[in-house]
UniProtKB/Swiss-Prot annotation:
The gene coding this protein: trpE
Protein name, UniProt field: Anthranilate synthase component 1
Family recorded in the similarity comment: Belongs to the anthranilate synthase component I family.
Cofactor: Mg(2+)
Reactions accelerated catalytically: chorismate + L-glutamine = anthranilate + pyruvate + L-glutamate + H(+)
GO molecular function: anthranilate synthase activity; metal ion binding
Classification via Pfam families: Anth_synt_I_N, Chorismate_bind
Binding site for Mg(2+): E344, E481
Length: 508
C-alpha cells in the first residue's frame, strides 16, 4: 500500500464520496478480448476499436461489477437501481436520472488522457424517440427488452492501443459517515481488489477455444435459417408507398428496414469473436446485461462530446476496397464523383448541422471536413465532419438527444420520416437504429449508431438492416440492400453456429 496514495485518498475523502484510484500497466502481452474473456463472470461490456484503417480506432474499454443501473421500459420514465435491484429514484428524463447519480456519487474528477474514465455505458433503443418527439409508439413490440439501459461499473479497464497502455480504474464509494479507520480499510480493500482483477486479466486464455483461421470474411451469408419480419412482396409495396410520400412532398428520404430472426445455439460472445475477425470496425461492442447479449460492429458515430466540443461525422456513400492500390484509387474516384451519393451525403451534412445547431453556441457550427474519402478495412465511405461548441446552459446529454436517432437510419425530415416508418414497418425496431453510448462523469460522450448489431435473447439472434428510399429507388434493389447490409452479421452468426454450436436448434 502506497503511503502517498493513502494520504491523498484520505484528503480527497473529505470532499468527495466516490474516489477513483488508478493503476497503469504496459499492455504488451494482453489485449481487450482476452482480458474480457478472463473477467466474463463480472464483466458486462466490451467496447473496442478494431479497424486499423480507421482514424477513430484507438481506445477500448471493459466494465466490471456494475453497482448502479439506469433503465427505462418505454423512455417515458427512468429508474436508478442498485446492484441488488432496489430502486433508488425515478426520474422523468434520462438527463435528470443521470444528474441524480452525479449528485449522489459526488465523484472526484480524474485527469487522464483516455476519453472515458467512468460513468454510464449502455444503449438507447430506437423506440425511445416516441418519448421525445411526436412519433407514435409502435403497437407491435415483439422482442421484449428495455428501451434504455445503462450501467455504472465499479472497475474499468481502459486500453490505449496507440500507447500500448492499460489503465485499471477502481471507484471507492463512501457514505460520508466513515471513521478514518474505515476509510483506510476501504482503501486497502480497493488495493486488494485491483490486484485480484489484474491477476485475473493476465491469466492465459486456456478456457477459450481457438478461432480457426479458416473463418472467412469473404464467405457469403446464406440466410438459410433466417426468418424476416417482412414478407418480400409487402416490403416492395412499402418501398412504393415511401416513394408516394416523397412525390407528395412529405419527405426526401426514409430508411425502410427489415429484421431477420435466427435460432442460435452459439452464444453472443462466440458471435462477437467471429464478427470482429470478419468485419472489424471503429465501433465494436459486446454487452451481457439484463438477460440480453448485444453484439455489434458499427461503422458510424452518432455524436461525440469531448470537453464540450460536439462532433458528428456523417457517412453516406459506399464502395468496397480495391484488390490493388490502383483499383482502390479508381473506386475512390468513382465514389467521390457519384452525383447520387454526393446528393445524399449533402442532405446528411445539413441534418448534422441542424442537430448540432440545436445545442451549440451561435456561430460555432462548422464543417471542417466535407466529402472526404474515409477508408476502412473492407469498404470506403464519403465522410464529412460537423462540429460546434456546446452552449453554456446545455448538458452533454442534450446533445446526444438532439442527434437521436441519426438521419442515416431514419430519413429527412427526421420526424415525418419516422412517422411514416412507424406506419409501414411491421414491428418495433427495438435497439436497431438507436445508440450505443458512454456518458462520462466528466461530460464526455461517445456514441455510435446501433447498426450492424445483433440482439441475442432466449435462443434467437435478431439482426436488422435498412435501405434509404428516395424518389428513384428500385424496390428489388432496396430489398437486396437490406440483405447486403445484414450479411456480415449473418455470416458471423452462421460461422459461429458451424464452429461452436451444440445441440438442437429452435425454429423462429
Amino acid at each position: 500500500m502506497s503511503a502517498d496514495g493513502l494520504a491523498a485518498f484520505l484528503a480527497e475523502a473529505n470532499e468527495f464520496r466516490t474516489i477513483p484510484i488508478v493503476r497503469k500497466f504496459v499492455a504488451d502481452v494482453i489485449e481487450p478480448l482476452g482480458v474480457f474473456a478472463n473477467l466474463r463472470e463480472e464483466a458486462v461490456f466490451l467496447l473496442e476499436s478494431k479497424d486499423d484503417e480507421s482514424p477513430w480506432a484507438r481506445y477500448s474499454f471493459i466494465g466490471v461489477a456494475p453497482f448502479l443501473t439506469l433503465e427505462s421500459e418505454t423512455g417515458e420514465t427512468f429508474s436508478v437501481k442498485d446492484e441488488n435491484g432496489n430502486e433508488q429514484i425515478t426520474a422523468p428524463t434520462l438527463k435528470e436520472a443521470f444528474q441524480w447519480v452525479e449528485r449522489t456519487l459526488a465523484v472526484k474528477p480524474l485527469a487522464e488522457t483516455v476519453p472515458f474514465t467512468g460513468g454510464a455505458v449502455g444503449f438507447l433503443g430506437y423506440d425511445f424517440i416516441s418519448a421525445i418527439e411526436k412519433v407514435p409508439r409502435h403497437k407491435n413490440r415483439d422482442v421484449p427488452m428495455k428501451t434504455a439501459y445503462f450501467v455504472f461499473c465499479e472497475s474499468l479497464f481502459a486500453f490505449d492501443q496507440k500507447k500500448r497502455e492499460l489503465l485499471v480504474i477502481h471507484y471507492i464509494r463512501l457514505s460520508g459517515n466513515e471513521t478514518e479507520e474505515e476509510k483506510i480499510e476501504a482503501y486497502r480493500a480497493a488495493e486488494r481488489r485491483m490486484a485480484d482483477l489484474a491477476a485475473k486479466a493476465a491469466r492465459p486464455q486456456a478456457e477459450q477455444p481457438l478461432l480457426p483461421a479458416e473463418s472467412e470474411s469473404g464467405r457469403t451469408a446464406s440466410f438459410a435459417k433466417a426468418v424476416s419480419n417482412y414478407d418480400k412482396k409487402q416490403f416492395l409495396r412499402d418501398v412504393e408507398a415511401v416513394k408516394r410520400y416523397i412525390a407528395a412532398g412529405d419527405v426526401f428520404q426514409a430508411v425502410l428496414s427489415q429484421r431477420f430472426c435466427v435460432p442460435v445455439q452459439a452464444g453472443g460472445f462466440a458471435i462477437y469473436r467471429l464478427l470482429r475477425y470478419i468485419n472489424p470496425s471503429p465501433y465494436m461492442f459486446y454487452f451481457q446485461l439484463d438477460g440480453v447479449e448485444i453484439v455489434g460492429s458499427s461503422p458510424e458515430k452518432l455524436i461525440q462530446v469531448h470537453r464540450r466540443r460536439v462532433e458528428i461525422d456523417p457517412i453516406a456513400g459506399t464502395r468496397r476496397r480495391g484488390r490493388s492500390p490502383e483499383e482502390d484509387e479508381r473506386l475512390a474516384d468513382e465514389l467521390y464523383h457519384d452525383p447520387k451519393e454526393r446528393a445524399e451525403h449533402y442532405m446528411l451534412v445539413d441534418l448534422a448541422r441542424n442537430d448540432i445547431g440545436r445545442v451549440a453556441k451561435y456561430g460555432t457550427v462548422e464543417v471542417p471536413v466535407l466529402l472526404q474519402i474515409g477508408k476502412f478495412s473492407h469498404v470506403m465511405h464519403l465522410i464529412s465532419k460537423v462540429v460546434g461548441e456546446l452552449d453554456d446552459n446545455v448538458h452533454p446529454i442534450d446533445a446526444l438527444l438532439a442527434a437521436f436517432p441519426a438521419g442515416t437510419v431514419s430519413g429527412a425530415p427526421k420526424v415525418r420520416a419516422m412517422q411514416i416508418l412507424q406506419e409501414l414497418e411491421p414491428t418495433a425496431r427495438g435497439l436497431y437504429a438507436g445508440a450505443i453510448a458512454y456518458i462520462g462523469f466528466d461530460g464526455n460522450i461517445d456514441s455510435c449508431i446501433a447498426i450492424r448489431t445483433a440482439v441475442v435473447k432466449d435462443g434467437y439472434a435478431y439482426v436488422q438492416a435498412g435501405a434509404g428510399i428516395v424518389a428513384d429507388s428500385v424496390p428489388e434493389l432496396e430489398w437486396k440492400e437490406t440483405r447486403n447490409k445484414a450479411s456480415a452479421l449473418m455470416n458471423a452468426i452462421e460461422q459461429a453456429e458451424r464452429l461452436f454450436a451444440k445441440g438442437e436448434r429452435a425454429v423462429c
